[in-house]
A protein has these predicted regions:
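N-terminal glycine-rich anion-binding loop in soluble enzyme alpha/beta folds
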Residues: 1-57, 121-163
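Glycine-rich phosphate/diphosphate-binding loops that line cofactor/substrate pockets in enzymes
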Residues: 2-5, 66-68, 107-116
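Periplasmic-binding protein-like
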Residues: 12, 70-77, 119-120, 178-185
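Short, well-structured alpha-helical segments in soluble
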Residues: 54-70, 166-178
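Glycine/small-residue-rich loop that forms an oxyanion/phosphate-binding "nest" at active or ligand-binding sites
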Residues: 58-104, 108-109
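Short Gly/Thr/Asp-enriched flexible loops that form oxyanion-binding sites at enzyme active sites
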Residues: 82-93, 133, 191-198
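Hydrophobic, well-structured mid-protein blocks that either form specific transmembrane helices
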Residues: 90-140
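Hydrophobic alpha-helical
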Residues: 165-198
């Protein structure tokens, strides 16, 4: 498949800037697929600001689909979805293209593994983790969050693959009866150590 015939997918983030984890993600994209990563700049200091950003997300993403001819959209950032629960359906209706979210796709992956209890690693605070846990509970998955702080927001960007591995290893040893480890929040980037974890 030539580049001109590649499937063109939008990957929209509520963040305002390009994260280093995007480079790791793009390295996984197969031939024949073009992924446009588009930061939308929907919050400045706190993920809680996203509770008021659903309309802006909808407008910006709908415009990008029309301008760039995206065949589908991946909406990143669990905090966006858990604070704007109707956003995925509104995006599907407004854009007319398939839309998935971080939570929807990750939940589907956990179900494919028949995992009913997962250790959930995030760079979020306790209140945001509670919302993520509520979503997962509604999907039939018992979420277990580590007792130790993983570093929230931009601080999580400074973690090396070795540090992410050690955090996950320690959290797994402290958790009971989990069937999977689920990384939510790519700022806590596990891509450099997934094979070692498995």
């Amino acid at each position: 498949m030539t580049a001109s015939h590649a499937v063109h997918i939008g990957f929209v983030s509520p963040n305002a800037k390009w994260g280093a984890h995007y480079d790791d993600l793009l390295a996984l994209v197969p031939d024949g697929v073009q992924v446009d990563i588009q930061p939308l700049g929907l919050y400045r200091t706190s993920l809680n600001e996203l509770s008021e950003a659903g309309g802006d997300h909808l407008a910006k993403t709908t415009q990008l689909v029309a301008e760039r001819g995206w065949a589908g959209v991946a909406v990143t950032g669990a905090p966006m979805q858990v604070q704007n629960k109707d956003l995925p359906e509104r995006l599907r209706a407004a854009t007319g293209v398939p839309v998935t979210t971080a939570l929807e796709s990750s939940t589907a992956a956990l179900r494919a593994l028949s995992a009913e209890r997962a250790l959930v690693m995030t760079p979020f605070d306790a209140s945001m983790n509670a919302l993520v846990g509520e979503y997962l509970k509604g999907a039939g998955i018992d979420a277990v969050f580590p007792e130790t702080a993983l570093g929230t927001g931009p601080g999580a960007l400074a973690l090396s693959a070795d540090e992410v591995y050690e955090l996950a290893k320690g959290a797994l040893m402290a958790a009971s009866d989990v069937e999977a480890i689920y990384f939510q929040g790519a700022r806590l980037n596990p891509l450099g150590c997934l094979e070692r974890m498995e």
